[in-house]
Amino acid sequence: MALMSQAGSSHCIYSEKMKCISGHSSITSNMEMLKMKDICFGNISSRNSSKPMQGIYLDRVGVERRRGRLAIVAASPPTEDAVVAAEPLTKEDLVAYLASGCKSKEKWRIGTEHEKFGFEFGTLRPMKYEQIAELLNGIAERFDWEKVMEGDNIIGLKQGKQSISLEPGGQFELSGAPLETLHQTCAEVNSHLYQVKAVAEEMGIGFLGTGFQPKWGLKDIPVMPKGRYEIMRNYMPKVGSLGLDMMFRTCTVQVNLDFSSEADMIRKFRAGLALQPIATALFANSPFTEGKPNGYLSMRSHIWTDTDNNRAGMLPFVFDDSFGFEQYVDYALDVPMYFVYRKKKYIDCAGMSFRDFMNGKLSPIPGDYPTLNDWENHLTTIFPEVRLKRYLEMRGADGGPWRRLCALPAFWVGILYDEVSLQTVLDMTSDWTAEEREMLRNKVPTSGLKTPFRDGLLKHVAQDVVKLAKEGLERRGYKETGFLNEVTEVVRTGVTPAEKLLELYHGKWGRSVDPVFEELLY
């Protein structure tokens, strides 16, 4: 996932030359953070906890300072081999980790991630792992990316702050760098698609921009050689009926956005959750399953309702007066674990408790205690509609064609990065009940913008929200409003992308889904 914990994190105690456990010197890169004082959460410990906050400093290159001891924490988990714990983590440490994401407004960035389905032009069948490996190697060699390996298998690429990774069924994911403007975001997407196509087309491979695999069943999807996915694959059927579909047959586009303080995080979290069903409707793009209409406009969104309700959903507690970083930590601690990573291997801990882990009582590795990398890994196994890490992830949209990959971050940046639009949304949604939010979340995958809401349709609310997003982008002053054109047309007509595909299926396509591979080809 795109990591937006770049230089500028505001939870900083020291900034000095430090002698690390390895014996090497490391100089922290965030001198300016000393000036930020308690912009982020100087009052958290007094408001949310009886214990004083432990001093943690976690910078971009992964140096941790805690209780006067030093340890190296590698920047890209899982890399537990680099961690030497001074003493067991406390709950306060976990809270401080989330709070370390706070940034002053001038350091806010946009991190966009998208997934896509690779397929063979001749057969429309999903890419096999061997083809994916050839593609990754080709991109690495031609465009100077660094290879990411798991054992002998190539499983991804890195270049600067961008990374390419593989979802369980070979879905090809770009996790973009933290960027300042939507122009940069769209340029990054275009550059990535150019590079992928340059290699893939020579192999007879294309990529499809949709939210759910339209033609092939689970048995037809290849399994990627990644240890964490094997653990998830074994666990999913125990906790929901659609978890394997989520893993192997869905694609999304999401944006990761920053916050300045705990209070700012809360406001953005609430606005994001309230409006997430609107984003789901605007980007609904997964109406086909195994060659036929599936009864949904966003099958991808529906799948999350029966994947694992311990780790998905609309998080009603975010709207409680007591909500803050500490309450999210309490929630995350109660989400069952999937795995820990030790000695270059994933250890199955599915269903076990992170609280037990913190007490050294995790049965597969008794006496072992978690590191911040373990905590970061655990946070990536939680899948609500909006997810908190050291930034907020908006997770409600289906994958789609490249213009929509630019429109999704534009929608959320216009709302969440503009104070006037954000406050207007909070005022607009302040009297929405938890039951209404849940109703929208459950009905939108089927009825989209035609979902009844109060005395009208969701379309009418969406029109107001898209207008607020546009006004927010205008106030940013970067001439970014054009990126909203895709969703402006959707709210004008009330017709979602999925409904357009269904119209083609029943008409021009002669009840075949095969043409969708051309219609939504990148």
From Swiss-Prot:
Q: Where is the transit peptide?
A: 1-45
Task: Answer yes or no on keyword Ribosomal protein.
Answer: no
Localisation per UniProt entry: Plastid, Chloroplast
The main location class comes to: plastid
Q: In which organism is this protein found? A: Nicotiana tabacum
Q: List the disulfide bonds.
A: C186-C406
| Annotated family | Belongs to the carboxylate-amine ligase family. Glutamate--cysteine ligase type 2 subfamily.
Subunit (UniProt): Homodimer or monomer when oxidized or reduced, respectively.
Protein name, UniProt field? Glutamate--cysteine ligase, chloroplastic
